[in-house]
Amino acid sequence: ENIGLEATKVKLDRGHIVTDGYGATGEAGLYAIGDVTGAPWLAHKASHEGIICIEKIAGMKHVHPIEDNSVPGCTYCRPQVASVGLTETKAKQAGYEIKVGKFPFLANGKAIALGDDEGLIKTIFDAKTGALLGAHMIGPEVTELIQGYVVARSLETTEAELMHTIFPHPTLSEAMHESVLDAYDRAIHF
């Protein structure tokens, strides 16, 4: 507020600066990243926006804008909460026919051994293509685990590829695998 934006070609949407996928505003040579551009208000999103913006300004080739549905959301509490992509509701609203898998940490050997078996992992897939639409987690170290699904989404990995991925044992990440298997009625340990 009151920084002179009204004298520029910068556009606002509900108080946030409108940018293209590279941080450029409507005013030539003026860029914006981070919280001023709107949700999600996450440090890792802002940091990545800064990198993309600088790469674009520097004229680098193959700069990829952020896809909002691929930004991981993490809440650092106990139990931890993490997510990426669409929720079941949003996927249905977008017209997807979905498959959903869930796996509780109380059935994961590593979580039991750690004495931290509260929570679960849920995965949401496009029933037609097998695309991973979203993943949601509550439990031990899920703010670390979510990156596996972020990478899977960014590489456009399907459920078949995730089902055939070998997850080390005993690890918390095995719950990720079991959640994928559960979406296709193939869970092993629950």
Annotate the PLM regions.
Residues 58, 77-190:
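Flexible, glycine-rich terminal cap/loop adjacent to redox cofactors
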Residues 1-61:
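FAD-site-proximal beta/loop scaffold in flavoenzymes
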Residues 29, 71-72, 133:
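Short amphipathic alpha-helical segments
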Residues 40-47, 53-90:
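Rossmann-like dinucleotide-binding cores of NAD(P)H-dependent redox enzymes
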Residues 22-25, 63, 141, 154:
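A generic short alpha-helical patch detector that favors 3-5-residue windows
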Residues 24-25, 29, 67-68, 113-115, ...:
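Solvent-exposed alpha-helices and their adjacent loops that cap or buttress functional pockets
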Residues 11-13, 60-70, 96-101:
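A short alpha-helix-loop-beta-strand transition element characteristic
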